Design a protein with these regions (language model features):
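Beta1/beta-strand and adjacent pyrophosphate-binding region of the FAD-binding site
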Residues: 3-16
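N-terminal Rossmann-fold NAD(P) dinucleotide-binding loop
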Residues: 19-20
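Glycine-rich FAD pyrophosphate-binding loop
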Residues: 24-46
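Predominantly flavin-linked oxidoreductase catalytic cores and closely associated redox partners
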Residues: 29, 108-242
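A conserved beta-strand/loop capping segment in the N-terminal third of enzymes
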Residues: 53-104
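FAD/FMN-dependent oxidoreductases across multiple families
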Residues: 124, 140, 221-298
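C-terminal helical "tail/cap" subdomain of flavin- and related membrane-associated enzymes
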Residues: 296-385
Length: 385
């Protein structure tokens, strides 16, 4: 068997938003970058596909070709009832199909000079003092740095000894065909339902031709999720034939705990680093942000000839994990006491505007927690009425 050897500055394992963004940022600075994606591209990915405004602002290329629906409204219900509708009066985000969105980022990375290889399943990595070797069935890729952006069960974290104990949410989702009038009615509006999923929530995100309907549990078991999904669809009047529903499940590794995310010449980004937001499970923003931090650290390390990645973990913990710790506290309250929390948090103007500010990127979870704590007696009294 002939083993081909490829040499580069950086090998990125995984072609999702974290891997694609890191490859783009490094390639445009002149580094020699190879992306290894195990699936054939463009590949299907289970995800509600919500892009917040702050995520779009992090990416400096045009995404309009992959937008499905511009989001201007939000709706929250409790077990299908007690609706609270938000009219933002402006676009606060977009929905996308993940196969198209992820592929667009990889195409931008390729245009910037990265080599994108699909159908390349990484078997393992070997870290060395001055670099690393990434092995696939077809060959080995020698490089100065490896970025593990290969998701919740990534091989890079396992191979490098960076896979610590993590808490993960479990999500189940389907892309549901709906009549034109139903699609039209839901266009521009993201819908969240609380109380119908044990220790979690359900959602409906509009796309051009389908609705993304899903459920996620932050402390639950995957076994009950299918029943929760059908129950949610019934509650919301989304009729379907259960035998025709193709639901896909996935893990959402939650952030909010300081971790070591680098070792030698290897670092982790996105879901591989366990950086999803623990209140909603939002992962794309943190994937992109961690990838940009990774690219900065790697570029500096290679430019200075040190290969020292030690500032990466400290930066992620300070700039991302610290705030996710507050989201984790809010999630603990919201999902343990869903009915009270719905009235305390979702129906209160302070909770609404505070959460909107976090989504916009104007505020943080730390700020939101501080405001809610300061006004807790008044909000609680109002919620108990």
């Amino acid at each position: 068997v002939t083993v081909t050897t490829t040499r580069s500055d950086v090998v990125v394992v995984g072609g999702g938003p974290a891997g694609g963004t890191a490859a783009y940022e490094l390639a445009r600075r002149g580094l020699d970058v190879v992306v290894l994606e195990k699936e054939k591209l463009p590949r299907c990915k289970v995800c509600a596909g919500g892009l917040t405004l702050k995520t779009v602002q992090l990416l400096d290329f045009d995404l309009t070709s992959v937008y499905e629906s511009a989001i201007t409204r939000g709706k929250c219900t409790f077990k299908g009832r007690s609706p609270v509708v938000f009219d933002f009066g402006e676009v606060v985000g977009w929905t996308v199909m993940r196969d198209k969105f992820d592929y667009l980022i990889l195409q931008e990375a390729a245009t910037a000079g990265a080599q994108v290889l699909d159908g390349e399943k990484v078997r393992g990595i070997e870290s060395q003092s001055t670099g690393a070797i990434v092995r696939t069935p077809g060959g080995e890729f020698r490089c100065s740095v490896v970025i593990g952006a290969d998701g919740a069960n990534g091989v890079v974290a396992r191979s490098s000894g960076l896979r610590g104990q993590r808490r993960a949410a479990v999500a189940l989702e389907t892309e549901m065909e709906a009549p034109p009038d139903v699609l039209e009615a839901r266009l521009g509006c993201v819908h969240f339902d609380f109380g119908s999923v044990p220790r979690g929530y359900g959602w409906v995100f509009p796309k051009k031709e389908v609705l993304s309907v899903g459920v996620g549990s932050f402390w639950g078991r995957a076994t009950s999720l299918k029943a929760s999904l059908f129950s949610l669809m019934e509650l919301l009047g989304l009729r379907c034939d259960p035998s025709q529903v193709k639901a896909r499940g996935h893990l959402v590794p939650l952030g909010g705990v300081d971790r070591v995310l680098h070792k030698g010449r290897v670092l982790l980004a996105g879901d591989a680093a366990g950086l999803a937001e623990p209140l909603t499970g939002e992962g794309i923003y943190y994937a992109v942000r961690s990838a940009k931090i990774a690219a900065d650290v790697i570029y500096r390390a290679l430019r200075h000839g040190t290969g020292d990645l030690s500032s990466y973990s400290a930066q992620i913990n300070a700039e991302i994990t610290r705030d996710l710790r507050y989201a984790r506290r809010l999630a603990g309250l919201l999902y343990r006491l869903p009915r009270l929390s719905y009235r305390f948090f979702v129906t209160s103007p302070m909770g609404q505007s505070g959460m909107a500010d976090v989504i916009y990127g104007r505020s943080s979870f730390e700020q939101l927690c501080g405001d809610l704590l300061k006004n807790a007696p008044r909000l609680l009294l109002s919620a108990l009425r």
